[in-house]
Each structure stands twice: as C-alpha cells, then as structure tokens.
Regions:
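Extracellular/periplasmic metallocenter environments
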Residues: 1, 28, 81-147
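Envelope-exposed proteins and targeting segments
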Residues: 15-19, 38-42, 52-54, 83, ...
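N-terminal pre-domain segments of enzymes
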Residues: 1-15
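Short beta-strand and strand-turn-strand segments in soluble, beta-rich domains
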Residues: 72-81
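N-terminal edge beta-strand
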Residues: 11-41
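Beta-strand signatures of extracellular beta-sandwich domains
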Residues: 55-59
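Short aromatic-acidic-glycine turn motif
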Residues: 62-73
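Asparagine-centered strand-capping/turn motif at beta-strand->loop junctions
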Residues: 46-48
C-alpha cells in the first residue's frame, strides 16, 4: 500500500533526518532540490506559506505525470496518499518516506496549473557511501608546490 517507484511510506522510528520545505504562491518549493541516501527514511516537514492551497507529492517522473493527469480530469478529487501532503494556506504537514531506490525522483504540487507553472523539485537518491575515507579527504592544494 502506498509503494511507488521512489520508495515506500516510512516509519517515524526510523527517521534519520528532517528536511523542511516551504511552498509559496510563486508556485515554488524551497529548497527545490534534495539529496538523500538509498535506504534513508526522511521526515519532510512541509509548510504552505502562500494564500492558495498547495500540495507536495513524491514519486518518479511517471508517478507524478500520471497523478497530474488524474488531477486535471478530476480537479476536486479527494486523495490522501502516504507520499503526499495537501495543505491550505498557513498549514504545516509532514511526509515520512523511505527511499529504497537509487535515482532521480520528483516532488511536485499537482493543484491544477501549479505543476505546469514550475512547482516541482528533484530528489536525488544516491548509494550509501561504503568508503568513509573518501568523505573526509580534502582536495590537496598543489598551488604552492615547487620543483
């Protein structure tokens, strides 16, 4: 139930970090780009700072496209899925999601016309780094090196 290409509903006890996202009437998400590791469970705390209703839906490009087409056909359709949050002006909500696949996924607002106006963002899921050394290494500065 609720599983899509981007992963599956997460369990609060497994949340590794919280990412805050705001939605505005400029039809923008802030931030509009998020990077997570495969297997991570993320709590998205989403706030609608606009006057209009906005939503945040997480999925693959195909999931979002299909959902958007449904919303165009049935604009008043009530839908409550674990991969989305639907917020009136000033409201705050959350999505707890576990990213099980590596790749690029989307989050978008599918209120009629908002997606087309550019209300979308990218979630990049990367493989967890097994080599911890690579993380701490700083690039060596060779500018002072002389022969």
């Amino acid at each position: 139930e609720g599983v899509n290409k981007a992963g599956k509903p997460g369990v609060a006890a497994n949340v590794v970090r919280t990412i805050h996202i705001t939605m505005s009437d400029k039809n923008r998400f802030s931030p509009n780009s998020v990077k997570v590791k495969q297997g991570e469970t993320i709590r998205f705390v989403v706030k609608n700072v606009g006057k209009k209703k906005h939503e945040m839906v997480i999925g693959s490009v195909e999931d979002i496209k299909a959902h958007n087409e449904m919303m165009q056909r049935f604009p008043g359709m009530e839908h409550d899925e674990p991969n989305m949050v639907d917020l009136e002006s000033g409201q705050k909500g959350e999505i707890i999601w576990q990213f099980t696949e590596v790749g690029q996924f989307q989050f978008a607002c599918l209120v009629t016309g908002h997606f087309e106006a550019g209300m979308k963002g990218v979630i990049t899921v990367v493989k967890p780094s097994t080599n911890v050394k690579a993380k701490v290494q700083t690039p060596v500065d060779h500018s002072t090196h002389q022969h």
